[in-house]
Amino acid sequence: MFVEVSGTTPMLIGCATCHNPHGSDSTAELREPISTRDTTNLCIRCHMRNAAPDTANTRGPHSPQGPTLLGRSGWLPPGFVWDSTDVPTHANAAANPRLCVTCHMDTLNVNAAGGTLAWHYTGHGFYAAPCVDTAGVDSTDACDVSVRSFAACSASGCHASGGAARANFQAIEQEMAFLTGTLWTDVNGDGKIGSGDTGLLTQVPATEFKRDSIITAAEGALFNVQLVAVDGSHGVHNPPYLRALLTATIQAVKQKYGLSVPPAQAARLARLAAGLGRGVALR
């Protein structure tokens, strides 16, 4: 749902949100193109809010999916340089010309136990890995990853099978959980750094979170942890970028506040830093 700038009534996202009933120059009468890698992209026009920290806004990231896909989101630690032209497949206009739509609008036939067609999913739920059963696609999107359909990943030709894509997803999800957890795990889920929580940010003085005209390393790191959570893809939108960004963020927090992590964590972080590859500079 959304609310117009000049209004107060929540509006449902419907056909006319993306399609122009009066016609357009784009495919399927879309309001904007789907292949552009900037803010003129149909999906990114909305999914681009509060993708970087701003001293005028204390609510953190809002809908940062577009800039994250393009490698342009988050707080950039001192010395961190990312070559945004070195893009992974998901954001590569040549390898994936339909960008968001390839994953989020794949069609799917759901068969009954006997193999007959029970439901045809048109992709307009926008689930990249939908929950499916013989009744159709579960709109709660709350099922376990083991029963989600990763058919879009194999149909695109990017992954050998849905099972292979699922395994990749789980590996990326675990890696992001390790990196964000090294910075902060909100154990009680209250959205605040407090007693009982874990991670480097729990060891930083509270004065570093003043929310004034200066974005401290601690505030930037907190933003990046929130970025991964709010993005909602568990890191899949841009694994190389988020991996590099979080690794650099951890280094920045450790250096700024003189902190350390247990040896096992340090060894894993060192392996990640060594494998970041081209497109990244940590100075």
Which sequence ranges carry the predicted segments?
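C-type cytochrome heme-c attachment and multiheme electron-transfer modules
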Residues: 1-283
